[in-house]
Amino acid sequence: VAREMVKTGGGSIVNMSSVNGTLAIPTIASYNVSKGGINQLTRVMALGLADKGVRVNAVAPGTIATELAAKAVLTSDEAKAKIMMRTPMKRLGEPTEIADTVAYLASDAASYITGEIVVVDGGRMTLNYTVPV
C-alpha cells in the first residue's frame, strides 16, 4: 500500500493497535508484544514516508463494546466491574468511536499528523492503571 501511495503522491495509513501495546500484562504477553510492535512499525514507517507525502498513524483502543470483548474480557459482572474501575469515563467505547478516529486520521483534516498512536480508551491510560499481576 505504501509503495502505491508514494507513486501516486501521498496518502494516509492507519494501523490498529491497542492500549495493550503500551501496557505489560503477563497473562497476555504475546498480545502486548504484537501491539507494541505495531506502535513501533507505525513510528518507523511515519519517519520513512513523511517526505514522500504518506502519513502513518495508529489507533489504540481500550475496551470496546464488541462481540470479541464480550467473549474475551466481559465474561462476568465482576469482569465488567474491573473494566469500569480502570476506565474513568465509566463506560465501554463504541465501535463507531474507533471508526470516527480512523476516519479523522485518514482525512485531510489530519494532514499534519504522522507517527502518532492515538489512544481511544475512556481515560484508562491517563489513569495509569493496569491489572494486578
PLM segments and residue spans:
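Hydrophobic structural elements of the Rossmann-like NAD(P)H-binding subdomain
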Residues: 14, 56-59, 69, 115, ...
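C-terminal helical subdomain
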Residues: 58, 78-109, 113, 120-122
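Alpha-helical segment proximal to the catalytic Tyr-Lys
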Residues: 3, 47-51, 111
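Active-site loop immediately N-terminal to the catalytic Tyr-X3-Lys motif
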Residues: 23-29, 51-52, 90, 95, ...
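Active-site helix of classical SDR
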Residues: 34, 42
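A glycine/serine/threonine-rich, flexible loop-to-helix segment
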Residues: 51, 63-86, 127-133
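Residue(s) in the substrate-gating loop at a strand-loop-helix junction
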Residues: 18
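Short C-terminal tail/terminal secondary-structure segment
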Residues: 23, 103, 114-133
